Amino acid sequence: MIPGEVQTAGGDIELNAGRRTLSISVANTGDRPIQVGSHFHFFETNGALSFDRDKTRGMRLNIPAGNAVRFEPGQSRTVELVEYAGRRHVYGFNGKIMGAL
């Protein structure tokens, strides 16, 4: 083994296996691009993003950690969300939850 080397199992690694997902259409109604990171609580995203927020409570983008999705002004796109796991407590972001989901 080389110091710092990462050894992984062979084959594909399935992200978020067994978790509930949701595909939802999102439109940027603002005049500036909006970027949402992989672990941001989607329910609390920028108010210029138009979508059914109630359906997204407790969910985040179903993309690899560290990635993001960018919504250009006037753009609509469908994204896939995945439920948070673990204790399901959300703190920070825009302060709309600040506790258990």
From Swiss-Prot:
GO terms for cellular component: urease complex. The keyword Metal-binding does not apply. Pathway: Nitrogen metabolism; urea degradation; CO(2) and NH(3) from urea (urease route): step 1/1. Its EC number is 3.5.1.5. Keywords: Cytoplasm, Hydrolase. It catalyses: urea + 2 H2O + H(+) = hydrogencarbonate + 2 NH4(+). Pfam families: Urease_beta. InterPro entries: Urease_beta-like, Urease_betasu_sf, Urease_subunit. GO terms for molecular function: urease activity. It is found in: Cytoplasm. GO terms for biological process: urea catabolic process. Heterotrimer of UreA (gamma), UreB (beta) and UreC (alpha) subunits. Three heterotrimers associate to form the active enzyme. Belongs to the urease beta subunit family. This is Urease subunit beta. It comes from Nitrosococcus oceani (strain ATCC 19707 / BCRC 17464 / JCM 30415 / NCIMB 11848 / C-107). The lineage of its organism: Bacteria, Pseudomonadati, Pseudomonadota, Gammaproteobacteria, Chromatiales. The gene is ureB.
